[in-house]
Every structure is written in structure tokens, then in C-alpha cells.
Amino acid sequence: MSAPQAKILSQAPTELELQVAQAFVELENSSPELKAELRPLQFKSIREIDVAGGKKALAIFVPVPSLAGFHKVQTKLTRELEKKFQDRHVIFLAERRILPKPSRTSRQVQKRPRSRTLTAVHDKILEDLVFPTEIVGKRVRYLVGGNKIQKVLLDSKDVQQIDYKLESFQAVYNKLTGKQIVFEIPSETH
């Protein structure tokens, strides 16, 4: 049996992080099918983000190398954590870093990899946010004042799993990136 502290890759965990780590340990001990997959998994931090309607979303940040391990059990893990934390939607995101754009005055030792650019990180956040659903299309709508709203079209086969979470996805993406976004699930009327 592992301690809840071992599930957190942070020096000073918050109360919420300890509660979620305790829920991880309880799930690991209670369900034998999740035990093998959950044992090596750890998370870095958790942010609680307000969503419209008095709900909250828990954005759980995990290290990028262990994201694939979380994806294996994400649907079961999300369902169980949402049972434990009522009125909160659970979202798993990889902890990614954006390197600043090189300027003329700053001397770069190495070339900035594509995966560390702002665009690449924001696209990956979007993919992590809606996992296991696939993004089938993107549109950018330009408003009169110069603002942009990104419209993301999601796969309609997963409508029951994510339909109630679309507002949470919008709030989390807006809070993390500062970009306006609208999620839509196109209907299959051809």
C-alpha cells in the first residue's frame, strides 16, 4: 500500500492535492483491474477552475512521459474521481512548458524545439482536454473588434461521454491559454 504523498510530484502539496492522492490510493487498493495501471502513475499539481453554473473543474497536471499511462485508464479513473468529488469535472492534462520566442538580443544556445512553442503547447492542451474524443475540425471566427473565437468540432460518437463537460472544457482552456473557444459536436444529418 502506497502513501498518498507518493502520488504527488510536489514538495508542498495542497489540501486538494492530498485529497485526490488519497482517492488515487483508495482506487488502487479497491479495484484489482486498475491496480497495476495506477501504481506507477503520479501527478504534478492540481488547479481548481470555476465553471459557469457554480460547478468546478479539477485540472490534474501529469508529467508528459506518464500521459500515455493515464490515457490507458482515463475513462475509468475520471468516472471514479467524479463520483468521489461531486460537482467537479476531472480533466487530465500534461504539464508542458513554453519556451520564449528567441529575440535578436537574447543569445540562444539551442534551437527551440517545435514542441515547446506556444502554438504547439496550446494545440496539445486542446487534445489532452477532450481525450478520448477526437477533434474532427477547427474553425477560427474573427469578430469585428479584432477578437478571435476558435470553434472546435468534436467527434459525435462520444456525445454521451463529453456532452455535459463542454462548458468545463471551455472554462479550463480559456483559463490556461487566455483564448476564447467554443466546442461543438456536429450532428450526423447527411
Curated annotation (Swiss-Prot):
Give residue numbers for the modification (N-acetylserine): 2
Enumerate the Gene Ontology biological process terms: cytoplasmic translation; ribosomal small subunit biogenesis; ribosome biogenesis; rRNA processing
Gene Ontology cellular component terms for the protein in this record? 90S preribosome; cytosol; cytosolic small ribosomal subunit; nucleolus; nucleoplasm; small-subunit processome
Q: What is its main location?
A: cytoplasm
Record-level Gene Ontology MF annotations:
structural constituent of ribosome
Covalent cross-link site, Glycyl lysine isopeptide (Lys-Gly) (interchain with G-Cter in ubiquitin): 83-84, 124
Give the quaternary structure. Component of the small ribosomal subunit (SSU). Mature yeast ribosomes consist of a small (40S) and a large (60S) subunit. The 40S small subunit contains 1 molecule of ribosomal RNA (18S rRNA) and 33 different proteins (encoded by 57 genes). The large 60S subunit contains 3 rRNA molecules (25S, 5.8S and 5S rRNA) and 46 different proteins (encoded by 81 genes). Interacts with snoRNA U3. uS11 interacts with MPP10. Component of the ribosomal small subunit (SSU) processome composed of at least 40 protein subunits and snoRNA U3.
Instruction: Relate the protein's function as given in its record.
Output: Component of the ribosome, a large ribonucleoprotein complex responsible for the synthesis of proteins in the cell. The small ribosomal subunit (SSU) binds messenger RNAs (mRNAs) and translates the encoded message by selecting cognate aminoacyl-transfer RNA (tRNA) molecules. The large subunit (LSU) contains the ribosomal catalytic site termed the peptidyl transferase center (PTC), which catalyzes the formation of peptide bonds, thereby polymerizing the amino acids delivered by tRNAs into a polypeptide chain.
Identification of the protein by name: Small ribosomal subunit protein eS7A
Organism lineage string = Eukaryota, Fungi, Dikarya, Ascomycota, Saccharomycotina
